[in-house]
Design a protein with these regions (language model features):
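Transmembrane helical cores of multi-pass secondary ion antiporters/exchangers
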Residues: 1-403
Length: 403
């Protein structure tokens, strides 16, 4: 296992730096590296590392959700208004609808499996979008209408919305039936998860205010409690459904609201943790990918399905901007910004396969193809279009100085 980890980190860091230099998202390289090192090509990765990959992916998901909660700014939603709120769920909803309609027609899957596939593919990638929006904001592009802030606010909630839907749909696929009990269990698990997160968040915030704790210990406490909430969900699943993922997000959000300084310290440490788990996550997704299936006719059909879904998604994104003062060019830029996928697809794409669901291979392959297709496409569209599509605020200052 240790030699495998050495290869993953050594080759991952070197190749990742090269890809960043040529302005291609490094996660693309990580996935390709995993495919090369995995059973599909050279079969170098030790089986013991593959055996614990599902646990590593779950830890990565916990880190993703905690960072989402810590970075979620409620004031941004108040400031951005209706468009930011709609961006947090409407494009993803349209994409899921598109896949639910066309998935059963094009692939050998039922409606529930198509919904599950849609929930995996529907999330936008903050890992690609957020750094670029920060860069735009610093350069003054789109600031006159707060476009970078609107996109960041919507994208942060988009992931949370899709992940909650994924776990809800997974329950439907596992039972393969849709009845009143299964329908009621979805909002109940969310409400219970929300309640647990609020209680734990307020208690932790109170303790953190009363006791001076260094940032490393703060991180260990929050991470340990997150593990505990996931374990609680597993222990109680035969009696009551609790969404531990919602609990983790809400806990992090409460800490950030009521103890901003401590929240920022935890955020910094979690960002460092993510650097490690990002590499592991995407490489292990590549390792789990069945290249023969991806290159088969079903793989080609998945590419077509993803493109159809992106059309649905883009239509949903356009609807969110109806009634705003955004120009055609600015609306087009928002559509581009909502195309790239990566983090969520990598963290939940293999879960269906690990749990033995019939559509597991299709879902994982779809997740990988969506990353390889949309991550570089979205990144390049953002990078090469923003100067043409967005207004630069400095122009106003220059006009004032000249006059």
């Amino acid at each position: 296992m240790f030699f495998s980890l050495f290869l993953v980190f050594a080759l991952g860091i070197i190749g990742g730096l090269i890809f960043e230099k040529i302005r291609i998202p490094k996660i693309i390289y990580y996935i390709l590296l995993g495919i090369l090192l995995g059973p599909s090509v050279f079969n170098i990765i030790d089986k013991s590392l593959i055996d614990i990959s599902s646990y590593l992916r779950q830890i990565a998901l916990i880190i993703i959700l905690t960072r989402s909660g810590l970075n979620l700014d409620i004031n941004n939603f108040k400031k951005m208004g209706r468009s930011a709120l709609l961006l947090s769920f409407l494009p993803a909803t349209f994409e899921i609808i598109g896949i639910t309609i066309f998935g059963p027609l094009l692939l050998n899957i039922n409606v529930f499996e198509a919904m599950l596939l849609g929930s995996v593919l529907a999330a936008v990638s903050p890992a690609i979008v957020v750094p670029r929006m920060i860069k735009l904001k610093e350069e003054g592009y789109g600031n006159n209408k707060a476009i970078p802030e609107m996109i960041m606010a919507g994208a942060s909630m988009d992931d949370i919305f899709v992940i909650v839907l994924f776990y809800s749909f997974k329950g439907l696929v596992s039972t393969n039936e849709f009845n009143a009990v299964s329908l009621l269990s979805i909002p109940l698990s969310i409400i219970l998860g929300l309640s647990l997160g609020l209680i734990v968040g307020f208690v932790i915030s109170f303790i953190f205010k009363k006791i001076n704790i260094n940032k490393i210990l703060l991180t260990i406490i929050v991470l340990g409690i997150s593990f505990g909430m996931v374990a609680l969900e597993t222990a109680l699943k035969n009696y009551v459904s609790i969404s531990s993922l919602v609990s983790i997000i809400v806990m992090a959000l409460i800490i950030n609201i009521y103890n901003k300084d401590k929240g920022n310290e935890i955020k910094g440490t979690y960002n460092s943790l993510w650097q490690v788990f990002e590499l592991l996550l995407f490489v292990l997704v590549g390792v789990a990918t069945d290249v023969r299936y991806a290159l088969s006719s079903d793989g080609a059909i998945l590419v077509g399905l993803i493109l159809i879904a992106l059309v649905f998604r883009s239509f949903g994104t356009i609807i969110t901007m109806i009634g705003t003062d955004l120009s055609f060019k600015e609306r087009l830029f928002v559509v581009f910004s909502y195309l790239p996928k990566a983090t969520v697809q990598a963290s939940i794409g293999a879960i269906a396969l690990n749990e033995g669901l019939m559509a597991g291979t299709i879902i994982l392959t779809g997740a990988v193809i969506s990353i390889l297709l949309t991550a570089p496409l979205g990144a390049l569209l953002i990078d090469f279009s923003y100067k043409k599509l967005l207004f630069k605020e400095e122009n106003i200052k220059n006009e004032i100085n000249i006059s």
